[in-house]
Protein backbone atom coordinates (compact mmCIF):
# COMPACT_ATOMS: atom_id res chain seq x y z
CA UNK A 1 0.00 0.00 0.00
CA UNK A 2 1.38 3.37 -0.98
CA UNK A 3 0.90 5.92 1.76
CA UNK A 4 1.99 9.49 1.05
CA UNK A 5 2.51 11.89 3.91
CA UNK A 6 2.38 15.57 3.05
CA UNK A 7 5.04 17.62 4.82
CA UNK A 8 3.60 20.86 6.07
CA UNK A 9 5.43 24.14 5.68
CA UNK A 10 6.47 25.77 8.93
CA UNK A 11 8.13 29.14 9.48
CA UNK A 12 9.27 30.36 12.90
CA UNK A 13 7.11 27.67 14.49
CA UNK A 14 3.86 28.79 12.79
CA UNK A 15 1.81 26.90 10.18
CA UNK A 16 1.73 28.96 6.99
CA UNK A 17 0.59 26.51 4.31
CA UNK A 18 -3.09 26.92 3.39
CA UNK A 19 -3.15 23.27 2.31
CA UNK A 20 -3.17 22.37 5.98
CA UNK A 21 -6.75 23.58 6.14
CA UNK A 22 -7.97 22.00 2.85
CA UNK A 23 -9.90 19.35 4.81
CA UNK A 24 -12.14 22.00 6.31
CA UNK A 25 -15.36 22.74 4.42
CA UNK A 26 -15.04 26.53 4.40
CA UNK A 27 -15.81 28.64 1.35
CA UNK A 28 -15.23 32.10 2.77
CA UNK A 29 -11.53 33.00 2.49
CA UNK A 30 -11.81 35.57 5.28
CA UNK A 31 -13.21 32.99 7.66
CA UNK A 32 -10.48 30.64 6.55
CA UNK A 33 -7.81 33.21 7.47
CA UNK A 34 -9.47 33.83 10.84
CA UNK A 35 -9.40 30.11 11.62
CA UNK A 36 -5.80 29.90 10.47
CA UNK A 37 -4.90 32.80 12.75
CA UNK A 38 -6.79 31.13 15.58
CA UNK A 39 -4.75 27.97 15.12
CA UNK A 40 -1.58 30.06 15.21
CA UNK A 41 -2.62 31.72 18.47
CA UNK A 42 -3.57 28.34 19.92
CA UNK A 43 -0.16 26.99 18.89
CA UNK A 44 1.60 29.90 20.65
CA UNK A 45 -0.48 29.45 23.81
CA UNK A 46 0.19 25.72 23.82
CA UNK A 47 3.93 26.32 23.34
CA UNK A 48 4.01 28.86 26.19
CA UNK A 49 2.08 26.48 28.45
CA UNK A 50 4.53 23.66 27.77
CA UNK A 51 7.55 25.91 28.40
CA UNK A 52 6.06 27.28 31.63
CA UNK A 53 5.33 23.76 32.79
CA UNK A 54 8.89 22.68 31.98
CA UNK A 55 10.33 25.67 33.83
CA UNK A 56 8.14 24.97 36.86
CA UNK A 57 9.18 21.29 36.82
CA UNK A 58 12.88 22.24 36.78
CA UNK A 59 12.34 24.80 39.53
CA UNK A 60 10.30 22.43 41.69
CA UNK A 61 12.46 19.33 41.20
CA UNK A 62 15.95 20.79 40.88
CA UNK A 63 16.41 24.25 42.38
CA UNK A 64 13.72 24.11 45.04
CA UNK A 65 14.56 20.51 45.94
CA UNK A 66 18.21 21.44 46.48
CA UNK A 67 17.18 24.34 48.73
CA UNK A 68 14.81 22.07 50.65
CA UNK A 69 17.54 19.46 51.11
CA UNK A 70 19.93 22.10 52.44
CA UNK A 71 17.30 23.53 54.81
CA UNK A 72 16.53 20.04 56.10
CA UNK A 73 20.21 19.41 56.82
CA UNK A 74 20.56 22.73 58.64
CA UNK A 75 17.36 22.22 60.65
CA UNK A 76 18.38 18.77 61.91
CA UNK A 77 21.96 19.64 62.86
CA UNK A 78 23.06 19.07 66.46
CA UNK A 79 25.65 21.85 66.21
CA UNK A 80 25.77 25.23 64.46
CA UNK A 81 25.84 24.35 60.75
CA UNK A 82 25.58 26.88 57.94
CA UNK A 83 25.39 26.25 54.21
CA UNK A 84 27.76 28.08 51.91
CA UNK A 85 28.30 28.53 48.19
CA UNK A 86 31.40 27.35 46.36
CA UNK A 87 32.89 29.34 43.49
CA UNK A 88 36.02 28.08 41.78
CA UNK A 89 38.33 29.05 38.94
CA UNK A 90 37.18 26.54 36.31
CA UNK A 91 34.79 28.93 34.58
CA UNK A 92 37.53 31.55 34.35
CA UNK A 93 39.90 28.94 32.94
CA UNK A 94 37.43 27.93 30.23
CA UNK A 95 36.77 31.58 29.41
CA UNK A 96 40.50 32.15 29.00
CA UNK A 97 40.79 29.11 26.73
CA UNK A 98 38.03 30.44 24.48
CA UNK A 99 39.15 34.08 24.56
CA UNK A 100 42.69 33.27 23.49
CA UNK A 101 41.74 30.60 20.97
CA UNK A 102 43.45 27.73 22.77
CA UNK A 103 40.46 25.48 22.19
CA UNK A 104 41.56 24.41 18.70
CA UNK A 105 45.11 23.86 19.92
CA UNK A 106 43.89 21.52 22.65
CA UNK A 107 41.61 19.59 20.29
CA UNK A 108 44.38 19.27 17.69
CA UNK A 109 46.81 18.09 20.37
CA UNK A 110 44.34 15.43 21.48
CA UNK A 111 44.00 14.22 17.88
CA UNK A 112 47.80 13.89 17.70
CA UNK A 113 47.75 12.04 21.00
CA UNK A 114 45.12 9.60 19.74
CA UNK A 115 47.32 8.96 16.71
CA UNK A 116 50.29 8.06 18.88
CA UNK A 117 52.06 11.33 18.07
CA UNK A 118 52.96 14.34 20.20
CA UNK A 119 52.36 17.98 19.37
CA UNK A 120 55.10 19.93 21.09
CA UNK A 121 54.83 23.44 19.66
CA UNK A 122 52.19 26.07 20.25
CA UNK A 123 51.40 27.70 16.90
CA UNK A 124 50.32 31.07 18.30
CA UNK A 125 52.44 34.19 18.60
CA UNK A 126 55.02 34.38 21.34
CA UNK A 127 53.59 37.83 22.08
CA UNK A 128 50.10 36.49 22.86
CA UNK A 129 49.00 38.37 25.97
CA UNK A 130 47.07 36.01 28.22
CA UNK A 131 45.89 37.46 31.49
CA UNK A 132 47.18 35.08 34.14
CA UNK A 133 44.70 34.86 37.01
CA UNK A 134 45.24 32.82 40.15
CA UNK A 135 43.84 29.58 38.75
CA UNK A 136 44.29 27.69 41.99
CA UNK A 137 41.88 29.95 43.92
CA UNK A 138 38.55 28.71 45.13
CA UNK A 139 36.10 30.67 47.24
CA UNK A 140 33.74 29.38 49.92
CA UNK A 141 31.06 32.05 50.43
CA UNK A 142 29.19 32.10 53.76
CA UNK A 143 26.81 34.67 55.24
CA UNK A 144 27.04 36.41 58.62
CA UNK A 145 25.81 39.64 60.20
CA UNK A 146 27.49 42.52 62.03
CA UNK A 147 25.85 44.88 64.54
CA UNK A 148 22.82 44.51 66.77
CA UNK A 149 20.73 45.44 63.71
CA UNK A 150 22.28 42.46 61.87
CA UNK A 151 23.79 44.15 58.83
CA UNK A 152 24.26 41.27 56.32
CA UNK A 153 27.54 40.39 54.62
CA UNK A 154 28.87 37.61 52.42
CA UNK A 155 32.28 36.37 53.55
CA UNK A 156 35.03 34.20 52.13
CA UNK A 157 35.59 31.38 54.64
CA UNK A 158 39.38 31.38 54.62
CA UNK A 159 41.51 28.85 56.52
CA UNK A 160 44.64 30.74 55.43
CA UNK A 161 44.00 33.94 57.44
CA UNK A 162 42.67 34.78 60.92
CA UNK A 163 41.01 38.23 60.88
CA UNK A 164 37.47 39.23 60.02
CA UNK A 165 36.94 42.33 57.90
CA UNK A 166 34.03 44.12 56.26
CA UNK A 167 33.89 47.15 53.93
CA UNK A 168 32.93 50.34 55.74
CA UNK A 169 30.54 53.13 54.73
CA UNK A 170 33.67 55.26 55.03
CA UNK A 171 35.26 53.35 52.13
CA UNK A 172 35.92 55.71 49.21
CA UNK A 173 37.43 53.32 46.66
CA UNK A 174 35.55 52.00 43.62
CA UNK A 175 35.55 48.39 44.80
CA UNK A 176 33.14 49.23 47.63
CA UNK A 177 30.45 50.67 45.36
CA UNK A 178 28.70 47.33 44.79
CA UNK A 179 29.24 45.85 48.27
CA UNK A 180 27.27 45.69 51.50
CA UNK A 181 28.83 48.37 53.72
CA UNK A 182 29.06 48.37 57.50
CA UNK A 183 27.58 51.46 59.19
CA UNK A 184 28.61 51.69 62.85
CA UNK A 185 26.19 54.57 63.48
CA UNK A 186 23.26 52.19 63.01
CA UNK A 187 24.41 49.68 65.64
CA UNK A 188 23.90 50.27 69.38
CA UNK A 189 26.53 47.64 70.26
CA UNK A 190 29.37 49.33 68.33
CA UNK A 191 32.59 50.07 70.26
CA UNK A 192 35.16 52.40 68.74
CA UNK A 193 38.81 51.34 68.46
CA UNK A 194 40.29 53.19 65.49
CA UNK A 195 43.69 51.46 65.33
CA UNK A 196 44.85 51.62 61.71
CA UNK A 197 45.68 48.33 60.04
CA UNK A 198 46.65 46.83 56.66
CA UNK A 199 45.89 43.25 55.62
CA UNK A 200 48.12 41.50 53.07
CA UNK A 201 46.95 38.56 50.94
CA UNK A 202 48.39 36.76 47.94
CA UNK A 203 45.83 38.60 45.80
CA UNK A 204 46.61 42.05 47.26
CA UNK A 205 46.05 44.32 50.25
CA UNK A 206 43.21 46.12 52.02
CA UNK A 207 43.49 48.78 54.72
CA UNK A 208 41.26 50.26 57.39
CA UNK A 209 40.91 50.34 61.17
CA UNK A 210 39.79 48.12 64.04
CA UNK A 211 36.27 48.27 65.47
CA UNK A 212 34.25 46.08 67.81
CA UNK A 213 30.62 45.06 67.45
CA UNK A 214 28.24 42.15 67.68
CA UNK A 215 28.99 39.47 65.05
CA UNK A 216 26.35 36.83 64.31
CA UNK A 217 27.10 33.50 62.63
CA UNK A 218 24.03 31.33 62.24
CA UNK A 219 22.25 31.51 65.60
CA UNK A 220 25.32 32.49 67.63
CA UNK A 221 26.29 36.10 68.41
CA UNK A 222 29.33 37.52 70.19
CA UNK A 223 31.11 40.86 70.63
CA UNK A 224 34.12 40.64 68.33
CA UNK A 225 37.02 42.80 67.19
CA UNK A 226 37.16 43.17 63.41
CA UNK A 227 38.47 45.47 60.70
CA UNK A 228 36.47 48.17 58.92
CA UNK A 229 38.08 48.40 55.48
CA UNK A 230 38.17 51.83 53.82
CA UNK A 231 40.62 51.18 50.94
CA UNK A 232 40.41 48.18 48.57
CA UNK A 233 42.48 49.49 45.64
CA UNK A 234 45.31 47.12 46.50
CA UNK A 235 42.90 44.18 46.25
CA UNK A 236 41.84 44.83 42.66
CA UNK A 237 40.73 43.47 40.27
CA UNK A 238 39.88 40.50 42.53
CA UNK A 239 37.56 42.43 44.83
CA UNK A 240 35.37 44.12 42.23
CA UNK A 241 35.12 40.94 40.13
CA UNK A 242 33.95 38.78 43.06
CA UNK A 243 30.66 38.63 44.95
CA UNK A 244 32.03 38.56 48.51
CA UNK A 245 31.98 41.57 50.82
CA UNK A 246 34.65 40.59 53.33
CA UNK A 247 36.77 37.75 54.69
CA UNK A 248 36.17 35.59 57.76
CA UNK A 249 39.49 34.08 58.80
CA UNK A 250 39.56 30.50 60.10
CA UNK A 251 43.31 30.27 60.56
CA UNK A 252 45.50 30.56 63.65
CA UNK A 253 45.92 33.52 66.02
CA UNK A 254 49.59 33.98 65.10
CA UNK A 255 48.42 34.72 61.55
CA UNK A 256 46.15 37.54 62.70
CA UNK A 257 46.84 41.26 62.70
CA UNK A 258 46.39 42.73 66.19
CA UNK A 259 46.69 39.34 67.96
CA UNK A 260 42.96 38.66 67.67
CA UNK A 261 41.67 35.18 68.51
CA UNK A 262 39.98 33.47 65.51
CA UNK A 263 36.21 33.75 65.79
CA UNK A 264 35.78 30.01 66.49
CA UNK A 265 38.22 30.20 69.42
CA UNK A 266 36.50 33.34 70.72
CA UNK A 267 33.13 31.59 70.56
CA UNK A 268 34.51 28.97 72.95
CA UNK A 269 36.15 31.64 75.14
CA UNK A 270 32.71 33.21 75.57
CA UNK A 271 31.10 29.79 76.27
CA UNK A 272 29.02 29.89 73.10
CA UNK A 273 30.31 26.50 71.89
CA UNK A 274 31.77 23.45 73.64
CA UNK A 275 34.73 22.76 71.35
CA UNK A 276 36.96 25.16 69.42
CA UNK A 277 36.73 23.37 66.10
CA UNK A 278 35.00 23.60 62.75
CA UNK A 279 34.37 21.13 59.95
CA UNK A 280 33.82 21.22 56.19
CA UNK A 281 31.56 18.87 54.26
CA UNK A 282 31.46 19.23 50.46
CA UNK A 283 28.81 17.05 48.79
CA UNK A 284 30.20 15.13 45.81
CA UNK A 285 26.96 15.52 43.83
CA UNK A 286 26.83 19.34 44.17
CA UNK A 287 29.95 21.25 43.17
CA UNK A 288 28.50 24.60 44.28
CA UNK A 289 27.39 23.83 47.84
CA UNK A 290 29.10 23.05 51.12
CA UNK A 291 28.44 22.93 54.86
CA UNK A 292 30.44 24.54 57.67
CA UNK A 293 29.83 23.26 61.21
CA UNK A 294 31.19 25.14 64.23
CA UNK A 295 31.70 23.77 67.74
CA UNK A 296 31.05 20.08 67.12
CA UNK A 297 31.07 17.21 64.63
CA UNK A 298 28.03 16.08 62.64
CA UNK A 299 28.55 12.32 62.35
CA UNK A 300 26.10 12.01 59.46
CA UNK A 301 28.55 13.86 57.20
CA UNK A 302 31.08 11.00 57.17
CA UNK A 303 31.43 7.23 57.35
CA UNK A 304 34.11 4.93 58.73
CA UNK A 305 36.83 6.01 61.16
CA UNK A 306 37.70 9.65 61.80
CA UNK A 307 41.50 9.84 61.91
CA UNK A 308 43.41 12.75 63.43
CA UNK A 309 46.77 14.04 62.24
CA UNK A 310 48.79 16.38 64.47
CA UNK A 311 49.80 19.77 63.09
CA UNK A 312 53.48 20.40 62.45
CA UNK A 313 53.16 24.20 62.18
CA UNK A 314 51.70 26.91 64.41
CA UNK A 315 50.46 29.11 61.55
CA UNK A 316 48.76 26.74 59.11
CA UNK A 317 46.54 23.67 59.08
CA UNK A 318 49.62 21.70 58.03
CA UNK A 319 50.31 18.03 58.73
CA UNK A 320 53.05 15.53 57.84
CA UNK A 321 52.29 12.74 55.37
CA UNK A 322 54.25 10.46 53.05
CA UNK A 323 53.19 11.04 49.44
CA UNK A 324 53.13 8.18 46.90
CA UNK A 325 52.16 8.22 43.23
CA UNK A 326 53.10 4.97 41.53
CA UNK A 327 56.81 4.45 42.20
CA UNK A 328 57.36 8.15 43.00
CA UNK A 329 57.60 8.88 46.70
CA UNK A 330 58.21 11.86 48.94
CA UNK A 331 58.59 11.02 52.63
CA UNK A 332 57.48 13.32 55.45
CA UNK A 333 56.07 15.96 53.14
CA UNK A 334 54.22 18.98 54.46
CA UNK A 335 50.53 18.81 53.53
CA UNK A 336 48.29 21.84 54.02
CA UNK A 337 44.55 21.13 54.10
CA UNK A 338 43.14 24.32 52.59
CA UNK A 339 39.61 25.54 51.87
CA UNK A 340 40.91 28.19 49.46
CA UNK A 341 42.56 25.99 46.81
CA UNK A 342 40.67 24.44 43.90
CA UNK A 343 43.41 21.93 43.06
CA UNK A 344 45.98 19.59 44.51
CA UNK A 345 49.27 21.47 44.39
CA UNK A 346 52.39 19.34 44.04
CA UNK A 347 56.13 20.15 44.09
CA UNK A 348 57.16 20.79 40.49
CA UNK A 349 59.82 18.08 40.34
CA UNK A 350 57.38 15.53 41.77
CA UNK A 351 54.74 16.57 39.23
CA UNK A 352 57.11 16.33 36.25
CA UNK A 353 58.11 12.77 37.20
CA UNK A 354 54.49 11.83 37.76
CA UNK A 355 53.33 13.10 34.35
CA UNK A 356 55.93 11.19 32.33
CA UNK A 357 54.25 8.79 29.88
CA UNK A 358 50.74 9.64 31.12
CA UNK A 359 49.43 11.02 27.79
CA UNK A 360 48.61 14.49 29.06
CA UNK A 361 48.82 17.84 27.29
CA UNK A 362 50.23 21.01 28.86
CA UNK A 363 48.08 24.01 27.97
CA UNK A 364 50.27 26.92 26.78
CA UNK A 365 50.75 29.75 29.30
CA UNK A 366 48.34 28.14 31.77
CA UNK A 367 49.33 25.99 34.77
CA UNK A 368 47.25 22.93 34.02
CA UNK A 369 47.06 19.80 31.90
CA UNK A 370 44.39 18.19 29.71
CA UNK A 371 43.84 14.52 28.96
CA UNK A 372 41.16 12.07 27.88
CA UNK A 373 38.70 11.40 30.68
CA UNK A 374 39.04 7.63 30.15
CA UNK A 375 42.85 7.71 30.34
CA UNK A 376 43.65 4.44 32.14
CA UNK A 377 47.24 5.50 32.84
CA UNK A 378 46.25 8.15 35.38
CA UNK A 379 47.54 7.21 38.85
CA UNK A 380 46.06 7.30 42.34
CA UNK A 381 47.57 9.58 44.97
CA UNK A 382 48.36 7.94 48.30
CA UNK A 383 49.06 9.97 51.43
CA UNK A 384 50.03 7.88 54.46
CA UNK A 385 51.02 8.28 58.09
CA UNK A 386 51.23 6.07 61.16
CA UNK A 387 47.56 6.87 61.75
CA UNK A 388 45.97 6.34 58.37
CA UNK A 389 46.03 6.16 54.59
CA UNK A 390 44.24 8.64 52.31
CA UNK A 391 43.89 7.96 48.60
CA UNK A 392 42.76 10.21 45.79
CA UNK A 393 41.65 8.48 42.60
CA UNK A 394 41.52 10.17 39.16
CA UNK A 395 37.74 10.65 39.40
CA UNK A 396 38.35 13.18 42.17
CA UNK A 397 41.08 15.24 40.50
CA UNK A 398 39.64 15.23 36.96
CA UNK A 399 37.41 18.11 35.85
CA UNK A 400 35.26 17.51 32.76
CA UNK A 401 35.62 20.20 30.07
CA UNK A 402 33.17 18.89 27.50
CA UNK A 403 32.61 22.37 26.02
CA UNK A 404 36.27 22.37 24.90
CA UNK A 405 35.99 18.91 23.36
CA UNK A 406 34.08 15.66 23.89
CA UNK A 407 35.69 13.28 26.36
CA UNK A 408 38.23 15.85 27.56
CA UNK A 409 39.19 16.43 31.18
CA UNK A 410 41.43 18.86 33.01
CA UNK A 411 43.74 17.67 35.77
CA UNK A 412 43.11 19.62 38.97
CA UNK A 413 46.80 19.30 39.77
CA UNK A 414 49.18 22.27 39.74
CA UNK A 415 52.94 22.44 40.19
CA UNK A 416 53.85 24.78 43.05
CA UNK A 417 57.12 25.04 44.96
CA UNK A 418 57.74 26.07 48.57
CA UNK A 419 61.10 26.30 50.38
CA UNK A 420 60.24 22.89 51.85
CA UNK A 421 58.44 20.30 49.64
CA UNK A 422 54.74 20.88 50.29
CA UNK A 423 51.41 19.62 48.97
CA UNK A 424 48.20 21.62 49.27
CA UNK A 425 45.19 19.34 49.65
CA UNK A 426 42.43 21.52 48.25
CA UNK A 427 38.95 21.00 46.82
CA UNK A 428 39.52 17.53 45.22
CA UNK A 429 40.75 16.14 48.55
CA UNK A 430 38.05 17.88 50.60
CA UNK A 431 35.30 16.49 48.36
CA UNK A 432 36.34 12.93 49.05
CA UNK A 433 37.15 13.52 52.72
CA UNK A 434 35.20 15.19 55.51
CA UNK A 435 37.66 17.43 57.36
CA UNK A 436 37.83 18.62 60.98
CA UNK A 437 39.94 21.65 61.95
CA UNK A 438 40.54 21.32 65.69
CA UNK A 439 42.06 24.28 67.56
CA UNK A 440 41.84 22.57 70.96
CA UNK A 441 43.92 19.55 69.95
CA UNK A 442 45.98 21.26 67.22
CA UNK A 443 45.09 18.64 64.65
CA UNK A 444 43.18 17.93 61.45
CA UNK A 445 40.63 15.12 61.40
CA UNK A 446 40.01 13.20 58.17
CA UNK A 447 37.22 10.75 57.35
CA UNK A 448 35.53 9.47 54.20
CA UNK A 449 32.75 11.90 53.32
CA UNK A 450 29.30 10.44 52.78
CA UNK A 451 28.23 10.62 49.15
CA UNK A 452 24.55 10.70 50.03
CA UNK A 453 22.98 12.05 53.20
Swiss-Prot record:
Active site, per annotation: 158, 338
All ranges on the Cytoplasmic side of the membrane: 1-37
Catalyzed chemical reaction(s): Hydrolysis of the bonds linking certain hydrophobic residues in hemoglobin or globin. Also cleaves small molecules substrates such as Ala-Leu-Glu-Arg-Thr-Phe-|-Phe(NO2)-Ser-Phe-Pro-Thr
Reported phenotype of the disruption mutant: Slight decrease in proliferation and slight increase in doubling time during the asexual blood stage.
Subcellular compartments: Membrane; Vacuole lumen; Vacuole membrane
Cellular component terms per the entry's GO annotation: cytostome; food vacuole; lysosome; vacuolar lumen; vacuolar membrane
Pfam family, one: Asp
InterPro entries noted in UniProt: Aspartic_peptidase_A1, Aspartic_peptidase_AS, Pepsin-like_dom, PEPTIDASE_A1, Peptidase_aspartic_dom_sf
EC number(s) on file: 3.4.23.39
Membrane spanning stretches: 38-58
SS bond partners: 171-176, 373-409
Post-translational modification: Not N-glycosylated.
Intervals, Lumenal compartment: 59-453
Described function: During the asexual blood stage, participates in initial cleavage of native host hemoglobin (Hb) resulting in Hb denaturation. May cleave preferentially denatured hemoglobin that has been cleaved by PMI. Digestion of host Hb is an essential step which provides the parasite with amino acids for protein synthesis, and regulates osmolarity.
Family membership: Belongs to the peptidase A1 family.
Subunit field text: Component of the hemozoin formation complex (HFC) composed of falcipains FP2A and/or FP2B, plasmepsins PMII, PMIII/HAP and PMIV, heme detoxifying protein HDP and falcilysin FLN. The HFC complex is involved in hemoglobin degradation and detoxification of heme in the food vacuole during the asexual blood stage.
PANTHER family: BETA-SITE APP-CLEAVING ENZYME, ISOFORM A-RELATED
Protein name in UniProt: Plasmepsin II
Native source species: Plasmodium falciparum (isolate 3D7)
Amino acid sequence: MDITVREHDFKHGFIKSNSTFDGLNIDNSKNKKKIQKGFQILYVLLFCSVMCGLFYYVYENVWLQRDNEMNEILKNSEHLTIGFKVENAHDRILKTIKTHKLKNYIKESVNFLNSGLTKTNYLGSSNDNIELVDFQNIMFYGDAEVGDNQQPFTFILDTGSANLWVPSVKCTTAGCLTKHLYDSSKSRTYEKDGTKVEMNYVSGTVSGFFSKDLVTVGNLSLPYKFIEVIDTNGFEPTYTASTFDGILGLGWKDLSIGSVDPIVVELKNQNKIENALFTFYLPVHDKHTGFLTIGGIEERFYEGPLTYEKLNHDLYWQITLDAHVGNIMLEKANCIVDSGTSAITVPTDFLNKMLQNLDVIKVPFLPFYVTLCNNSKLPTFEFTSENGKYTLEPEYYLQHIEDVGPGLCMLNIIGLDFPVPTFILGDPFMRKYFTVFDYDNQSVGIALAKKNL
